[in-house]
Amino acid sequence: MDFELEPSLEELIKQDTLKWIFVGGKGGVGKTTTSSSIAVQLALQHPNDEFLLISTDPAHNLSDAFCQKFGKDARKVEGLSNLSCMEIDPEAAMSDLQQQAQQYNNDPNDPLKSIMNDMTGSIPGIDEALSFMEVLKHIKNQKVNESDDSKDKISYRTIIFDTAPTGHTLRFLQLPSTLQKLLGKFQQLSGKLGPMMSMLGGGGQGQQDMFAKLNEVQKNVEEVNEQFTNPDLTTFVCVCISEFLSLYETERMIQELMSYQMDVNSIVVNQLLFADDDENPCKRCVARWKMQKKYLDQMAELYEDYHLVKMPLLGSEIRGVENLKKFSKFLIKPYDPKVDRGIITDLKEQ
C-alpha cells in the first residue's frame, strides 16, 4: 500500500450514499455500543436527516444502551430527535406469521396449512428469516411513495443494524440470496403445485393470495439483495477486541462477507487499555496491554487496507445519549491517551 487509511470512521459517517450499515462481531466485544455510537454520530453530523437503528439480536441491548425502552416499532431517541430505534422480536414475528397462515384457510385438514405450520416451527435459522422479513416489512412501510419508480425512496437516510453474534449475522446476511433462489424455484413449481393442491383439497382464494404474497416478497428480496451487494449503499463494520479468539472470529467473518460480495473495510477494536501512558499502571494492566499490542500489531499488518479504529476501555459503562455522544466522537477523531484520558472517568453514571 502506498498510503495508510485513516484510523477512524469519518469517511463512513460522511459518505452520502450509504443506506445500510451492519455492525457485527463475536459476543461481548461491544457491538451494541459501537452501533449506537455510529448511529449517534450520523445523527449529529447530519441533523436534517432521519436515521434508524435496528437490533436483530434476540438478546436486545439498545434499550439498555440508551436508557430508554424500545420495541418492535421505531421510536425516537430522547435527546436526539433525528434518530429512531427498534428491537425486532422473532417470537412475536413467528406468532404473527402463524396467525396469517390461519387467515388464509380455516380448514384444519388443508395439507398446505399443515405444511406451513410445520415449516414455521422447524426451519433452521427461522429466527433470522423472521427478523429479515420484519426488516423488509418496515422498509416497505418507509417508502415515501409506492407509485414512485425509484427503489431507494426510503424516509431514513441510513439504517444501522446492531446484529446478533457472528453465526446468526452471517445466516441473516445470506438470506436475501438464499430466499431469492428458493422463491424463484417455488414460483416455477407454483403452476404445477396449484392443480395438485386442488386435488388434495386445498387451493382456492387462500392459495392465490399466498402465491401473490410470495411474488411480492420475491420482488422485495431481489431489491434488498441488489442493495446489500452494492458498496455505495451497504457496508459492514466489524467489531472485536484485541485477543486471539476475537481476531480469529473477525478474520472468519470478513472471509464470509467477501464471499457474499458485501463491502467491509472498517474494524473497530474495543476495550484497549493504552497502559503506556498511565502514570502508575498496575502490573495486570501492563501485562494485558502488552498482549493487546501484540494482536493490534497483527491486525495492522493483516488489515493494512482497512480503517482500524482503536477505542479505549473506560472506567464505567457507556449508557445514555450524553455518554454515547462523548464516547462516539473517537470514531471520528482517533483517541489520544495523552490528550483524551479524562474521558475514562468523565462519564456520568446512569
Swiss-Prot record:
The active site is at residue 57. Its main location: cytoplasm. It holds the Pfam family ArsA_ATPase. Zn(2+) binds at residues 282, 285. Keywords: ATP-binding, Cytoplasm, Endoplasmic reticulum, Golgi apparatus, Hydrolase, Metal-binding, Nucleotide-binding, Transport, Zinc. It comes from the Eukaryota. One of its GO terms (molecular function) is ATP binding. Its EC number is 3.6.-.-. SUPFAM superfamilies: P-loop containing nucleoside triphosphate hydrolases. NCBIfam families: GET3_arsA_TRC40. ATPase required for the post-translational delivery of tail-anchored (TA) proteins to the endoplasmic reticulum. Recognizes and selectively binds the transmembrane domain of TA proteins in the cytosol. This complex then targets to the endoplasmic reticulum by membrane-bound receptors GET1 and GET2, where the tail-anchored protein is released for insertion. This process is regulated by ATP binding and hydrolysis. ATP binding drives the homodimer towards the closed dimer state, facilitating recognition of newly synthesized TA membrane proteins. ATP hydrolysis is required for insertion. HAMAP family: Asna1_Get3 (MF_03112). This is ATPase GET3. It comes from Candida albicans (strain SC5314 / ATCC MYA-2876) (Yeast). The gene is GET3.
